[in-house]
């Protein structure tokens, strides 16, 4: 059985029941399923504006930069897995480079700018 792709919304994973089958552009085999559950966008907005905002405000700019750097490192360590998944969309490795390496590089760049250009604390004066 293929994996059901879930959505992380309002602090929890949503999507247990399979819906649309997703097929590989390489060989036509089933690779995953989209989930059947509806997403509650009002709940997502509320969560972001309350819980998410409080979480961000609890971190200073340097901590946020470190979180971006950690995410970039995590993704970079798994780039070959991401390339393998991306191939099933019909994209070549070069096509996927912009998203995978480019996205990771952008996270590292933002982390570096935040670490070097933003002050400690969470206010800019």
Give a label for each model feature.
Residues 1-125:
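N-terminal Rossmann-like NAD(P)+-binding subdomain of aldehyde/semialdehyde dehydrogenases
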């Amino acid at each position: 059985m293929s994996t059901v792709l879930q959505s992380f919304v309002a602090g929890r994973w949503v999507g247990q029941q399979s819906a649309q089958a997703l097929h590989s552009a390489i060989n036509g085999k089933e690779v995953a399923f989209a989930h059947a559950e509806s997403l509650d966008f009002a709940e997502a907005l509320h969560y972001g504006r309350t819980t998410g905002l409080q979480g961000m405000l609890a971190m200073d700019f340097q901590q946020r930069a470190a979180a971006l750097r950690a995410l970039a490192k995590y993704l970079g360590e798994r780039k070959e897995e991401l390339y393998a998944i991306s191939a099933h969309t019909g994209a070549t490795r070069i096509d996927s480079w912009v998203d995978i390496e480019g996205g990771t590089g952008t996270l590292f760049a933002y982390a570096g700018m935040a670490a070097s250009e933003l002050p400690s604390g969470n206010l800019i004066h």
